[in-house]
Amino acid sequence: MERIKELRDLMSQSRTREILTKTTVDHMAIIKKYTSGRQEKNPALRMKWMMAMKYPITADKRIMEMIPERNEQGQTLWSKTNDAGSDRVMVSPLAVTWWNRNGPTTSTVHYPKVYKPYFEKVERLKHGTFGPVHFRNQVKIRRRVDINPGHADLSAKEAQDVIMEVVFPNEVGARILTSESQLTITKEKKEELQNCKIAPLMVAYMLERELVRKTRFLPVAGGTSSVYIEVLHLTQGTCWEQMYTPGGEVRNDDVDQSLIIAARNIVRRATVSADPLASLLEMCHSTQIGGIRMVDILRQNPTEEQAVDICKAAMGLRISSSFSFGGFTFKRTSGSSVKREEEVLTGNLQTLKIRVHEGYEEFTMVGRRATAILRKATRRLIQLIVSGRDEQSIAEAIIVAMVFSQEDCMIKAVRGDLNFVNRANQRLNPMHQLLRHFQKDAKVLFQNWGIEPIDNVMGMIGILPDMTPSTEMSLRGVRVSKMGVDEYSSTERVVVSIDRFLRVRDQRGNVLLSPEEVSETQGTEKLTITYSSSMMWEINGPESVLVNTYQWIIRNWETVKIQWSQDPTMLYNKMEFEPFQSLVPKAARGQYSGFVRTLFQQMRDVLGTFDTVQIIKLLPFAAAPPKQSRMQFSSLTVNVRGSGMRILVRGNSPVFNYNKATKRLTVLGKDAGALTEDPDEGTAGVESAVLRGFLILGKEDKRYGPALSINELSNLAKGEKANVLIGQGDVVLVMKRKRDSSILTDSQTATKRIRMAIN
């Protein structure tokens, strides 16, 4: 009240009024600017004049019991005056110092857990090595990069549910934790943060950093993985770069890297199978990366790479609308075109049918090591501005653009026949034929393209047919720029369709991706990739195929045995035997198969000649299309370890060795598993298999008529009983089952029951 009175007195003096109204501060706009809203408009100034006051801080009244009125030096720490307009106390900055030195301490055990991202960053920087600084022009291009090392890949919604569950478990609201990763993280974090005293909001913020991928569109010249991006400000400026090796890897970068390798391997393998799309899906669903299902990673991980995007398209996920050609990502920035089939003649007079894009279009092309802007009309390159790390990278971009332009002089530059094939030995489409041809050798293409004199434009120079720079002349329409072309920034995803040959199209039918675009680069994955699919057995070479095939037969012996006796054709066609065929010499495949199938048929016909070990050993050979011949073999050859090795039809060999005592099989010295049944009692195995669908009731019962042969059993009605002759002339009583459900267990129980019935 005192002050208000004082103000009234001041205002009544004309001089005060004059100062306040005539000086420039009386701009309503300025007054509004500094007084409206809660947001501080000049924080630095505010801080300065606040700190000049004796008691700039307010605190809860309880502070008076927790802090003495004066410190050791006798300075006052808080004032008895109340803060105007609240019931808080005015406190000196010295009180903060006192609190930090003498205040209560809490347990620090949770700090490293809550602030994990920061603690880990410090470790990475501590162990990282910074190299020399180089001054040079930096070709930076904006790319979408991950700025948050060490995160899981949950969606914002999934992360929100996890955070609520961990930090505010008693809050109301439906939370559904479905994915495996959500459940694991929630459990782990709840345990870590028991009795945590850190403010829940802070914990929530830090959890978000750990769970969600954060991306930014930043200018980058070097590495794009998150451990490089976190030190971007230290490693590259406008005209300098500093070498840096991170002091540790983070799982999210490893996941991205391993995902790309797995996807490439899977697409390459699927391409050569009979039904590429079905095979690809089967492999994606049965593969794990670092212990997490690949399909879960694909759903969450935004990595854009050709093979990864093909896998995503196969799973029905949306992908980026840009398309890929020659390893470059093309994004149309303006113009439009219609497509028309046209026949063209190469320099070798070979006819090619190409889909011509008619119309004016502009594209950005972004590759790993070069970028470009391309302007083209119908079968004509108008302008190409390219920038890249080195001569080689620039040349790659120029070749791709020249082929993409579909110009006649490019097609006429073809020397020799075009007959490139993919991994499945199918001819590539004409555009990829041309691309492969010129990627092998582009001399004629560059020589025939033509050159033109150039104007002096800032930041641009010419490039000659031999790929040397020039300021006078350049390849027609082509210029090299110092500046990179930014990657397409939008994160928009579109619905796509995929055909069985793995060609991905947008809704207008434009091909965005095809297996030809998948890089052949081999790398070593950072995380363990576990391919459970038989199609990937061969990725580790012939030995792995051999061991895996036999392991598979042993693991599935119960079902295999039944199929062997009842539906062999279906068994021979199983995809698990496909990889094995590549080990059998081509010339012998059909003869081996015919021989083994005949042998198996004799076993089925003549009861008692059933030999489990021999069936397992020879089964993979029967999968090839058989050739009918009278040939007999005592050993079969497989190509492993760089030469042919023999598998003996009767008896053990280094390739296939069954130890009767331990009942274990070793293939090429590697353990392939144990046989659960006794091979000597194999006859019972077959009969029980043949008696599938019948219940063995006991010894022969004369009331049910003479003993039938196994083949005559099929005429029985459900629930009907009959005597049947099995094995070495024994007769047992059986009943045809009323239900088909328990068929599989029959073969196991039958073995025991036959023994009981006979004995």
Curated annotation (Swiss-Prot):
Alphabetized Pfam families for the sequence: Flu_PB2_1st, Flu_PB2_2nd, Flu_PB2_3rd, Flu_PB2_4th, Flu_PB2_5th, Flu_PB2_6th, Flu_PB2_7th
Any one biological process term the GO annotation gives: DNA-templated transcription
GO molecular function, one term: RNA binding
Keywords, ordered alphabetically: Cap snatching, Eukaryotic host gene expression shutoff by virus, Eukaryotic host transcription shutoff by virus, Host gene expression shutoff by virus, Host mitochondrion, Host nucleus, Host-virus interaction, Inhibition of host innate immune response by virus, Inhibition of host MAVS by virus, Inhibition of host RLR pathway by virus, Inhibition of host RNA polymerase II by virus, mRNA capping, mRNA processing, Viral immunoevasion, Viral transcription, Virion
GO cellular component: host cell mitochondrion; host cell nucleus; virion component
Compartment annotation: Virion; Host nucleus; Host mitochondrion
Function noted in UniProt: Plays an essential role in transcription initiation and cap-stealing mechanism, in which cellular capped pre-mRNAs are used to generate primers for viral transcription. Recognizes and binds the 7-methylguanosine-containing cap of the target pre-RNA which is subsequently cleaved after 10-13 nucleotides by the viral protein PA. Plays a role in the initiation of the viral genome replication and modulates the activity of the ribonucleoprotein (RNP) complex.
Subunit structure of this chain's protein: Influenza RNA polymerase is composed of three subunits: PB1, PB2 and PA. Interacts (via N-terminus) with PB1 (via C-terminus). Interacts with nucleoprotein NP (via N-terminus). Interacts (via N-terminus) with host MAVS (via N-terminus); this interaction inhibits host innate immune response.
Name recorded for this polypeptide: Polymerase basic protein 2
